Amino acid sequence: LLEDSFGRQFHYLRLSVTEACNFRCQYCLPDGYDGPSSDHFMSLPEIDTLLKAFARLGTSKVRLTGGEPTLRRDFLDILHLTASTPGIERVAMTTHGARMEKFAANWKAAGLHQVNVSIDSLDPRQFAAITGQDKLKAVLRGLDAAIDCGLDVKVNSVLLNDFSDSRLQRFLAWLKEMPVTLRFIELMETGDLHQFFNKQHQSGSPLKATLMKMGWQPLIRRKDAGPAQEFYHPDYAGRIGLIMPYSKDFCKSCNRLRVSAPGKLHLCLFSENGIDMRELLAGGNVDEVVLFLQKVLGQKHETHYLHEGKTGATKHLAMLGG
């Protein structure tokens, strides 16, 4: 098993397959993507070697992220490869959802279990203002397609000062009938967005108090679950999650490692630098990658130090997909 010096075990790999994205979300890539081309990112054989090494060390869940992972022409191949790797029991992906109506059934057939979709507002104008794309209706049709074909669906929504007041009531009315988990995520500070963070960051604690007053009850976490505190209500088809990285003890339950699209291992979303694995992966020797991973895990810190204002090497969230 992969275990660090603080006794945390890592069952969960977040694998970024591209940094490119065709949305321009205010909290991520407000000016659009202007990074390296696709040949800068790991190839299918390199991803295969990586997955085999992680699986051998006890990784049972893999999430494919970006950027927007579906922009890779070989995304379906990556998905099938991940799902067919012995030891990988659960495959998830994070997407903006604009291509989901067309492809959800194909993803399911390739081995996908869960999809997380970013929806920061149910108001079309707000959605377009936040994302730079007038695609809310297409995304919502995609959600229906994902549910219809049996995928486990979660919706991610970033807490922002500008858009918070009317959003909650609209989302709650939506959750009455929608069997999805809606997770509100505190805005995280990244290297490129200090001013935006200072203006827009909102703690999730008041929202948690509001939900508890309304009768929402906490759920027990699964072994391979993410960092969300999840809540249910008997009158609602959907659930609500809160992801609050600035809260006390957030890092104690850390169970995931990250690999960026260019093949760097990030021991934390906010670590000072990634550890380059590309040459090792190109060699194709799974045993060597296993030894490397066991060796470097001792470098993982106890916490992300976000509360001290440190943002590490993450310039924007498209680099690692959260």
Predicted regions and their residues:
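A short acidic, helix-capping loop that chelates divalent metal ions and anchors anionic groups
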Residues: 33-37, 101, 123-130, 191-195, ...
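Auxiliary Fe-S-binding modules of radical SAM enzymes
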Residues: 1-13, 173, 177, 187-322
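Canonical Radical SAM [4Fe-4S] cluster-binding loop centered on the CxxxCxxC motif
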Residues: 5-45, 269
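Residues that scaffold the ATP/ADP-binding catalytic core of kinase and kinase-like folds
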Residues: 24, 28, 72, 125, ...
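Glycine-centered loop/turn positions within well-structured domains
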Residues: 23, 124-125, 249, 275
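Radical SAM/AdoMet-radical enzyme domain recognition
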Residues: 44-64, 68-185
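Conserved, mostly hydrophobic/aromatic
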Residues: 17, 25, 64, 117, ...
